[in-house]
């Protein structure tokens, strides 16, 4: 069995793509099971692919939240003279949302809970200055403890340019907020728009527009209003309104990720963890008087 970084023993391959494979591994130092994303040597040698993997590690390591897959470590290992980058993450058991949705729309309460938890995870990211930029069903895994966001590989810091130097936009066309097409700066409102698309898709089994190609999707984001939600038995009006508001063409008209998470969690009666809003503690007159007296002594 392969050993990485002097501590991670690869045990079982969980999946493989063009750029990387994902393994179940054992952390010999902390004696726990982890997941390891292992880049191919070719992609490790590719500057863009390597930077994307490192960006995923750095973005995910900025904060911890129960609805975000935790990042533990990043490093490189050499074998047969070739370097291989690896990312060590929380090992989660569950199904990706895109696979679950192959069976059709979700019950509105399930859809509401999933998107409330995604919103809560994003609220934590936004609170630490991170915009995910690629929220979609394939990047959400459903576990026994709730939904978890995956893959911060194309994440950006709030205020950073929202495109590569050559003008390329990172993300998935079906979930790109209209303002992202103007190639401005990364902002949390774009993630909220993607959650709006996700919620609509969970409720209906389809995208909010009749678009089949990338070009049609980009045109829809810019110019087409979303199709009204169909009648869904039991769906609270405030959930439908939240979905519509999240899909606003104007970023300033969308709710924050915190507001989205809290409204949806209340609608389905499932608590979520959102960052606290810190405010100065009010000082009562008697406390202020006591403090003043203490200073004057």
Task: Provide a role label for each language-model segment.
Residues 191:
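Conserved catalytic-loop aspartate of Hanks-type protein kinases
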Residues 81-96, 100, 104:
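Conserved short submotifs of the Hanks-type protein kinase catalytic core
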């Amino acid at each position: 069995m392969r050993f990485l970084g002097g501590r991670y023993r690869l045990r079982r391959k969980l999946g493989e793509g063009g750029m990387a494979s994902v393994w179940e591994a054992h952390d010999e130092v902390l004696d726990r099971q982890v997941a390891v994303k292992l880049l191919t040597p070719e992609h490790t040698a590719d500057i863009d692919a390597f930077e994307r993997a490192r960006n995923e590690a750095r973005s995910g390591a900025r904060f911890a939240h129960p609805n975000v897959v935790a990042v533990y470590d990043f490093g490189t290992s050499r074998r047969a003279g070739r370097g291989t980058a690896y990312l060590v993450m929380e090992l989660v058991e569950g199904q990706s949302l895109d696979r679950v949705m192959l069976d059709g729309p979700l019950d509105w309460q399930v859809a509401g809970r999933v998107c409330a938890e995604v919103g809560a995870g994003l609220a934590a990211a936004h609170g630490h200055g991170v915009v995910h930029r690629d929220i979609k069903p394939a990047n959400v895994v459903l576990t026994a403890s709730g939904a978890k966001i995956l893959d911060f590989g194309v994440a950006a810091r709030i205020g950073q340019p929202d495109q590569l130097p050559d003008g390329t936009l990172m993300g998935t066309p079906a979930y790109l907020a209209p303002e992202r097409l103007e190639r401005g700066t990364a902002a949390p409102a774009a993630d909220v728009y993607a959650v709006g698309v996700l919620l609509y898709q969970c409720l209906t089994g389809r995208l909010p527009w009749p678009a089949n190609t990338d070009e049609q999707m980009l045109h829809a984001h810019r110019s087409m209003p979303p199709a009204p939600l169909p009648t869904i038995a039991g769906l609270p009006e405030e959930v439908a309104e939240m979905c519509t508001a999240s899909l606003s063409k104007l970023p300033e008209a969308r709710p924050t990720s915190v507001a989205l998470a809290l409204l949806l969690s209340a609608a389905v009666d499932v608590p979520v963890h959102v960052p606290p809003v810190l405010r100065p503690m009010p000082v009562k007159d008697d406390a202020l008087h006591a403090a003043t007296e203490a200073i004057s002594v």
